[in-house]
């Protein structure tokens, strides 16, 4: 199964249309009944998430009727879909509103993510910023590109390697338990500056475009990471799980680090993740 250039254009249009029709009209316009907690007060779902995922899913089913479709919000109804990514002939993975906590709070740091996998390999990824209208598109073997709302396009490139005390990056330790949580958060004092966006879309956008040296996560849900990892790799970076093995569709544990190159990855693994 191959994905054509026309398919990529179609996927970009799907994401942008969902953002235009379902997400942005509800941004800073949510009622009390439009927001619900999933597992905690910081794990939310809104009507924008549900309706955007439904719109994208419907469009994908019409064009690719035999494909596996994995949506973050539909996952609770059928959790077998994530392991099935490991060998699905063709699959699409949707995060309709990545950064829902920010979205619900009225903070314009959220995105829509769509990844394409073929037989356990990510072959394309789209990360869209509904607020700015900008889109990152990554195609395996062809690079990663940022396309502005006005149509201007630039190829992405990761940051140059730097010494640890000059690095800017972030490790999401919210899903970690002690002692890992305390050790890693303390080790972040070794770098120049850290941050927390609470939004994988913008984190991968920043690290793939060279604005950050590294990012890391403990929880590996595919809608958060598949498209971003591909964009980072196509921009020249090195991404691997904490044990050094490649991150593959269907995997949800083991932690992940994205860095400018393998040497930088090993430095971060040793000095920041530790243990």
Set out the residue ranges of the language-model regions:
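An extended, acidic
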Residues: 157-275
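DPxDG-like acidic metal-binding loop motif
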Residues: 84-145
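Hydrophobic/proline-rich hinge and linker segments of small-molecule sensing/allosteric domains
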Residues: 143-148, 165, 169
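Residue-level signal for inorganic ion chemistry
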Residues: 23, 49, 60, 100, ...
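N-terminal subdomain of lithium-sensitive/metallo-dependent phosphomonoesterases centered on the IMPase/IPPase/PAP
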Residues: 1-97
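Generic detector of well-ordered alpha-helical packing
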Residues: 50, 73, 96-99, 130, ...
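Short loop segments at secondary-structure junctions
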Residues: 63, 117-121, 131, 140-143, ...
């Amino acid at each position: 199964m191959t994905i054509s250039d026309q398919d990529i254009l179609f996927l970009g249009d799907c994401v942008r249309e969902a953002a235009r029709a379902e997400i942005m009209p509800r941004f800073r316009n949510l009622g009390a009944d439009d927001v619900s907690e999933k597992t905690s007060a910081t794990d939310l779902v809104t009507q924008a998430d549900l309706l955007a995922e439904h719109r994208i899913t419907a469009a994908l089913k019409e064009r690719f009727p035999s494909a596996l479709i994995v949506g973050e919000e539909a996952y609770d109804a059928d959790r077998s879909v994530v392991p099935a990514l490991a060998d699905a002939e063709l699959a699409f993975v949707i995060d309709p509103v990545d950064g829902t906590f920010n979205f619900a709070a009225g903070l314009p740091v959220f995105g829509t993510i769509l990844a394409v996998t073929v037989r356990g390999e990510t072959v394309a990824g789209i990360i869209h910023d509904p607020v700015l209208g900008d889109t990152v598109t990554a195609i395996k073997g062809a690079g990663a590109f940022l396309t502005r709302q006005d149509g201007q396009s630039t190829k992405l490139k990761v940051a140059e390697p730097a010494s640890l005390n000059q690095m800017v990056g972030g490790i999401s330790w919210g899903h970690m338990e002690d002692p890992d949580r305390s050790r890693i958060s303390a080790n972040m004092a070794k770098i120049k500056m850290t941050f927390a966006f609470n939004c994988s879309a913008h984190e991968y956008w920043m690290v793939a475009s060279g604005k950050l040296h590294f990012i890391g996560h403990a929880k590996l849900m595919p809608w958060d990471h598949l498209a971003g990892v591909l964009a980072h790799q196509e921009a020249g970076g090195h991404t691997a799980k904490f044990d050094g093995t490649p991150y593959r569709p269907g995997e949800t544990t083991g932690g992940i680090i994205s860095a400018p190159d393998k040497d930088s990855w090993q430095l971060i693994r040793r000095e920041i993740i530790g243990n």
